[in-house]
Amino acid sequence: MPRVKRLAASHLSNSWNTIPHVTHHDEADITELEDFRAKLSDPVSGDKIKITPLAFIAKALTNNLKKFPTFNSSLDNISEGKITQKKYFHIGIAVDTPHGLMVPKIRNVDQKKIKEISEELKNVSELSRNLKIDKKEFFGGSITITSLGGIGGTYFTPIINYPEVAILGIGRSYKKQIFIKDKFLARTVLPISLSYDHRIIDGAEAAKSVSYTHLTLPTKRIV
């Protein structure tokens, strides 16, 4: 087994055996977001600007952490109930590489614009695949996003990246008929799977968190 996979296997096993995982599944209506992305263009050249949906999700998730700070924490001592509240917003991105799974961080997402986040996502993904990324980029995260959108599938149970307390799984978006104002409309929906540490996050808080995240996704306020 390659070294990266050995390290990942050990870390994932520890997380699964340590944290009581619960996964909350939902779907977000991203019709407006996809329409907005399709219309993005350079104001000077008029050329289309391609921004991955993951950049919007990372930004929306950061807003979520501000509203629900428990998700931006770590449980340091179970017996004493010591919880460390993080003051930064570093989003981990699970990257599938030929060497195994890597989770580099996009740091200070709250201070960056969508375009910056999108460019940084491409950069850290490429560095990870080429084994050129600094090891320090794998530590100090707030929460992790893992996306299977480019591969397929809908809902799954992502394993929390310990010592974080939650991870957001993203499936492949698809068209769905939704009944809105007395008629069915074709909408684009995104499957969401949020795994969380049930020792410090309860089901109601997780449900509120997911609802808030997908409510902020379709708006331009996060740009």
Task: Name each model feature, range by range.
Residues 214, 219-223:
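Single conserved hydrophobic/aromatic residue that forms the stacking wall/gate
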Residues 1-215:
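C-terminal catalytic/motor cores of large multi-domain enzyme assemblies
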